[in-house]
């Protein structure tokens, strides 16, 4: 049985309004640390209380360990304790994940986002041992990232119940969308729950989630904060209205993919953070025109 208030559980380490931040690149393709620091500060000013660095939207598959850690150190140095920093440290290799998790802790991360091992399709016992091995190696909280659309294998509820018993495994970022299973886990464990899929931000809050880790927030952080504030105040009608208003952004993200959407949307808003690294590509001119219409329709 859980203890404490589910709505605030985990917020001290993972925040409540979070963004899976892009990694800015220069024209030559190298990482742009100055732009990364400036962008992080912008999102904090807009209302984020935590940021995920080196997550999927941060192009973790195509950035090296040194780049990831340099960005983490730079943002921590500039922003201090004004924002919770969640470091994406997961991979399909447990030993590499342990190494990256330890390095991220040393670089100043408040917590870790560890994705389910992808491509290799491990068993539930393998998934359990992967996460507990990582958690045993660090002293900061771990968030399990359950995203079967990318990892193929989901983290089953029974496995999450087992993982919840580990003192360092403190949260779940859910991109699976099983609200019924999630509610049961929120009710009967101490895991903090985060929506990892923007269309389900409001439904997950209603189910007892602590918050959300957004992609559309790259251009809609203020609106997401307004949604959260309205929900906390019991004004569900306003929260729902904001959620509906943001649907054009959700559709654009689904159409373009998270990285392409976020970087292109920022460019349209006057923040050029560089092109994605291959195999992710920039949108076509026609796609940019449609995205501009989507931003206008969403009021951002």
Curated annotation (Swiss-Prot):
Cell compartments where the protein resides: Cytoplasm
Keywords per UniProt: Amino-acid biosynthesis, Cytoplasm, Diaminopimelate biosynthesis, Lyase, Lysine biosynthesis, Schiff base
Disulfide bonds listed in the record: none
Single Gene Ontology BP annotation: lysine biosynthetic process via diaminopimelate
Pfam family, one: DHDPS
Binding, pyruvate: 57, 213
Transmembrane segments: none
Catalytic activity: L-aspartate 4-semialdehyde + pyruvate = (2S,4S)-4-hydroxy-2,3,4,5-tetrahydrodipicolinate + H2O + H(+)
Similarity section: Belongs to the DapA family.
NCBIfam families, alphabetized: dapA (TIGR00674)
Record's protein name: 4-hydroxy-tetrahydrodipicolinate synthase
Gene this chain is encoded by: dapA
């Amino acid at each position: 049985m859980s203890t404490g208030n589910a709505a605030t559980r985990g917020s001290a380490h993972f925040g409540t309004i979070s963004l899976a931040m892009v990694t800015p690149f220069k024209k030559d393709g190298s990482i742009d640390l100055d732009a990364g620091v400036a962008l992080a500060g912008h999102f904090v000013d807009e209302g984020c209380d935590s940021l995920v660095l080196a997550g999927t939207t941060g192009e973790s598959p195509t950035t090296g360990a040194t780049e990831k850690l340099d960005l983490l150190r730079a943002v921590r140095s500039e922003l201090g304790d004004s924002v919770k920093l969640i470091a994406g440290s997961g991979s399909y290799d447990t030993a590499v994940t342990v190494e990256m998790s330890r390095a991220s802790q040393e670089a100043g991360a408040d917590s870790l986002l560890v994705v389910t091992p992808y491509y290799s399709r491990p068993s539930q016992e393998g998934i359990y041992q992967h996460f507990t091995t990582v958690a045993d190696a660090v002293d900061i909280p771990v968030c399990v990232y359950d995203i079967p659309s990318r990892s193929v294998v989901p983290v089953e509820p029974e496995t999450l119940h087992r993982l919840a018993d580990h003192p360092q495994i403190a949260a779940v970022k859910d991109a699976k969308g099983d609200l019924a299973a999630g509610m049961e886990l929120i009710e009967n464990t101490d895991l903090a729950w985060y929506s990892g899929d923007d269309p389900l931000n409001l439904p997950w809050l209603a189910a007892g989630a602590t918050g959300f880790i957004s992609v559309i927030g790259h251009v809609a952080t203020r609106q997401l904060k307004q949604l959260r504030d309205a929900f906390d105040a019991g004004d569900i009608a306003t929260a729902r209205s904001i959620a509906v208003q943001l649907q054009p952004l959700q559709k654009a993200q689904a159409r373009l993919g998270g990285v392409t959407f976020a970087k292109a949307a920022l460019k349209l808003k006057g923040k050029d953070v560089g092109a994605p690294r291959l195999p992710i590509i920039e949108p076509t001119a026609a796609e940019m025109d449609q995205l501009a219409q989507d931003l206008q329709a969403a009021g951002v």
